[in-house]
Curated annotation (Swiss-Prot):
Keyword terms of this UniProt record: Cytoplasm, Hydrolase, Nucleotide metabolism
Record-linked InterPro entries: ITPase-like_fam, Maf-like
Main location: cytoplasm
UniProt keyword Cytoplasm present: yes
Coiled coil start-end: none
Originating organism: Xanthomonas axonopodis pv. citri (strain 306)
Entry function: Nucleoside triphosphate pyrophosphatase that hydrolyzes 7-methyl-GTP (m(7)GTP). May have a dual role in cell division arrest and in preventing the incorporation of modified nucleotides into cellular nucleic acids.
Lineage, top ranks: Bacteria, Pseudomonadati, Pseudomonadota, Gammaproteobacteria, Lysobacterales
HAMAP family noted in UniProt: Maf
NCBIfam families tied to this protein: maf (TIGR00172)
Active site, UniProt feature: 69 (proton acceptor)
Protein name, per record: 7-methyl-GTP pyrophosphatase
Site annotation Important for substrate specificity: residues: 12, 70, 152
Length: 190
């Protein structure tokens, strides 16, 4: 079995990949995550997933490398990871009662081959009060998450609905697509 590397140090992605019961290592990719002028949220997610995988694959040319990225999209505007309580509050306020699209891309780069997939998840947030937003952020600061919430935790209480073909995509790694790509690359799953 060839070496498998996850180009991420995200605990969320590491936990998801662990579900496939494959041996893998993690390596932090060194990639500039800034959007390019005019780049759509889906194009940004796709480009970053490829760049993360390709950057690590250049260091480990005999390995298969998984790169993934997620970009939240509110009315065509990409929402980054908030980083601060204030920005998280502003994001949740803007998303209150709205449908937010999450573009989650995965790229598998290996010896002489690249495979890619893109998942779209739509999240309908319920109308949130200022008090609910503050209470949520105090209980579960999601400053490192696109959209300022953790759907695998208390953040699910902020939603009215989720529309997706892959429930794991919203956590940050579309496992249905990734399992398909890994099988195409010759990995035996299960």
């Amino acid at each position: 079995m060839p070496r498998l590397i996850l180009a991420s140090t995200s605990v969320y992605r590491r936990a998801l990949l662990g579900r496939l019961q494959l041996d893998f290592d993690t390596v932090r990719p060194e990639v500039d995550e800034q959007a390019r002028p005019g780049e759509s949220p889906s194009a940004l997610a796709s480009r970053l997933a490829v760049e993360k995988a390709a950057t690590v694959a250049a260091r480990f040319p005999d390995a298969w490398v998984i790169g993934s990225d997620q970009v939240a999209d509110l009315d065509g505007q990409a929402l980054g990871k908030p980083g601060t309580h204030e920005r998280a509050r502003m994001q949740l306020t803007a998303m209150s009662g709205q449908t937010v699209r999450f573009h989650t891309a995965v790229s598998l780069v290996g010896p002489e081959r690249q495979l890619h997939a893109l998942d779209l998840t739509e999240v309908q947030l319920r109308a949130l009060t200022v008090v609910e937003i503050e209470r949520y952020l105090d209980a579960e600061p999601a400053l490192d998450c696109a959209g300022s919430f953790k759907c695998e935790g208390l953040g699910i209480s902020l939603f009215d609905a989720i529309r997706s073909e892959d429930p794991t995509a919203l956590v940050g790694l579309p496992m249905i697509a990734l399992a398909r790509l890994l099988r195409q690359a010759g990995f035996q799953i299960p």
